[in-house]
Amino acid sequence: MGEPGKRVGIHRVRCFAKIKVFLLALIWAYISKILSGVYMSTMLTQLERQFNISTSIVGLINGSFEMGNLLVIVFVSYFGTKLHRPIMIGVGCAVMGLGCFIISLPHFLMGRYEYETTISPTSNLSSNSFLCVENRSQTLKPTQDPAECVKEIKSLMWIYVLVGNIIRGIGETPIMPLGISYIEDFAKSENSPLYIGILEVGKMIGPILGYLMGPFCANIYVDTGSVNTDDLTITPTDTRWVGAWWIGFLVCAGVNVLTSIPFFFFPKTLPKEGLQDNGDGTENAKEEKHRDKAKEENQGIIKEFFLMMKNLFCNPIYMLCVLTSVLQVNGVANIVIYKPKYLEHHFGISTAKAVFLIGLYTTPSVSAGYLISGFIMKKLKITLKKAAIIALCLFMSECLLSLCNFMLTCDTTPIAGLTTSYEGIQQSFDMENKFLSDCNTRCNCLTKTWDPVCGNNGLAYMSPCLAGCEKSVGTGANMVFQNCSCIRSSGNSSAVLGLCKKGPDCANKLQYFLIITVFCCFFYSLATIPGYMVFLRCMKSEEKSLGIGLQAFFMRLFAGIPAPIYFGALIDRTCLHWGTLKCGEPGACRTYEVSSFRRLYLGLPAALRGSIILPSFFILRLIRKLQIPGDTDSSEIELAETKPTEKESECTDMHKSSKVENDGELKTKL
């Protein structure tokens, strides 16, 4: 009876003992981790408004993922290869699920979301306090009552999101370095670029799902089910609107946990691809045994770890590749993270629509670029030198094309007393704001309240009171204000809730912006595979896992963590009006100075990415100096067969005896 069960168990293990099955499981792991990451990036604006925090704190929350990753990335990358790599990937996916669940907790621990407003949703009487009434005292000032102020502790709930994102970053750590090294170790060298290309294309399902789920949740009110949405005086286009961000994180938690299950069934090692087809499994077993014996003869795992690190630090091509990666991430991360905010404030669309358009236009072009690039690398057998040249040319083309976005400008939304005068004359960003005018001085209005209305004269006002409106009709978001003294010059003196919409010319420029984005993403993804192959092939086989981990470490330390924080702080400097908390403290930014925001959003990343050109030329020069036998086939390129530089020779001499012992094994493996 035990024999059939044993056969079933062996058959089940054999089903998972294939590199292509592992590739499929790794694709789903990439999809789940990218789904969580993309969804987080689409919800940053919602979190900013939910917790009434600045953009710099939002950047800190976003960077906390990299902090978690940074804590363990180097040790996972190196020591993970000594352990069971598939199981470590499975544990990482489960930990990511836990992090997503913790992120969603504040919704269940906080009370209902209260947006800044003075308007009662059912008010339609001319005596309401938010309207213009002569000789009235300001009874709606921000409270200074300690009992009320203590409620503002709810805004500190963003710390749960911070901690959850750190845990999510820790869980994500083993997936890329251990997954890529597992494929590199057990796949044919000529199939490796294709498999990585398939992986890059397959993982694009993650952004597609994330960009679909983001707008869906953003259009649902955060407290849906517990409030009557008909009574809301805000819509998804309002900068105070908060979508149901917590729903998506619960979905991501479940997906990550389910994704972890298959990895617990993969073996620690696989037969080298091609050997099992030739019946040469015994040769692979001997090679594995020889490799294990060599490891046992090492003086110690810690010493080997530091020797490999020294090897990598003495590799000039590797270090230049790391430098270009850091500069690239500094530029690209800022563009990706804050693109929804830029589209919302520059082109006047809702956050949900911005997220949907980003996914619709960018995901297909990136997928096509990855697939075409991987296919070309395999079929044409691009050499290392040609791959470096192709990557640099494509990257420079993408950078130059992105500069065209500077020409696509929309006018700043006219807001009386903020961006324009009450006569409609545009004001400079540096000018002192004058919220009061002759038409509303008698109303004794609050000047910090953000309840924007759009007059039929095309000018927006910060509140119905500042527009001089004396009467309101209707309820909820359909409320109309009448008898507005500041609008009477146009012949009709009514206003509706919300900022005025941008003109059709701005909508056309949005389309041009998105089309340019499509081509930029396509060129960027085309350059990724050849650039990544240069990075992989500049290391020895046994150094790749640690090299990938070190690269990820530096990218997170010098780009992933600081970039969203300093960029968010710079964006805060372009804020025109801050929301107000109950105790009078500033909350989330309600509107930005569009021209300054545009110059910052497009200019700083362009400068950072443009600085990559210099180290890229040095990489090309170093590659051309290398004497690579048989550089006609990319599968034959390994640094161990090249002529080392003077600096590499100096570093190698310190552990020459160790290298001699393993030289025969290394050549057999290569």
From Swiss-Prot:
GO cellular component: plasma membrane
Compartments, as annotated in UniProt: Cell membrane
Tissue and organ distribution: Kidney specific.
Carbohydrate-modified residues: 52, 124, 135, 483, 492
Residues bearing PTM Phosphoserine: 634-635
Transmembrane spans: 21-40, 60-80, 87-111, 156-184, 204-224, 243-267, 312-333, 354-377, 382-405, 514-536, 546-571, 606-623
Keywords: Cell membrane, Disulfide bond, Glycoprotein, Ion transport, Membrane, Phosphoprotein, Transmembrane, Transmembrane helix, Transport
Residue intervals annotated with topology Cytoplasmic: 1-20, 81-86, 185-203, 268-311, 378-381, 537-545, 624-670
Primary localisation category: membrane
Chain segments carrying region Disordered: 633-670
GO terms of molecular function: transmembrane transporter activity
Biased composition (Basic and acidic residues): 640-670
Residue numbers bearing the Phosphothreonine modification: 632
PROSITE patterns: KAZAL_2, MFS
A Gene Ontology biological process term: triglyceride homeostasis
Membrane disposition: Multi-pass membrane protein
Limits of the Kazal-like domain: 433-488
Disulfide feature: 439-469, 445-465, 454-486
Superkingdom, natural source: Eukaryota
Residues exposed to the Extracellular side: 41-59, 112-155, 225-242, 334-353, 406-513, 572-605
Family of the protein in this entry: Belongs to the organo anion transporter (TC 2.A.60) family.
Annotated function: May mediate the Na(+)-independent transport of organic anions.
Protein name: Solute carrier organic anion transporter family member 1A6
Organism encoding this protein: Mus musculus (Mouse)
Lineage: Eukaryota, Metazoa, Chordata, Craniata, Vertebrata
